[in-house]
Amino acid sequence: MSEYAIVAPEDFDQSVFRLIGKEWMLVTAKNQEGKVNTMTASWGGMGVMWGKNVAVTVIRPQRYTKEFIDQSESFTLSFYDDTFKKDLSYLGSVSGRDEDKIAKTRLTPTDANGIPFFEEAKIVLICK
């Protein structure tokens, strides 16, 4: 996808239950050295806490992607159509610590103001 429309969080009208629970998402971040890593997640949520819009996902401390998120001020949650299900499955089963797993998928890394995501995403949420 080469064109994106910016949507205010309060205007986001997609089913979070479907997106996260059924279609899955990629959690993607860049570390201080500029390397990008991603992981697949099928858990999380979106809502409002104390007047702030939030997106929530839980990442185990031993996950390689958590190191990237901890080093970054921003990360993305991105969603894909079903044709990328095998890619998301692969990205969720292999560690970027052991190999360049992104290179073994059909996904094309890109960024918005230095915040990484993939061109093929149908929805990208930039989180801070």
Say what each PLM segment does.
Residues 1-128:
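Active-site-proximal mixed secondary-structure blocks
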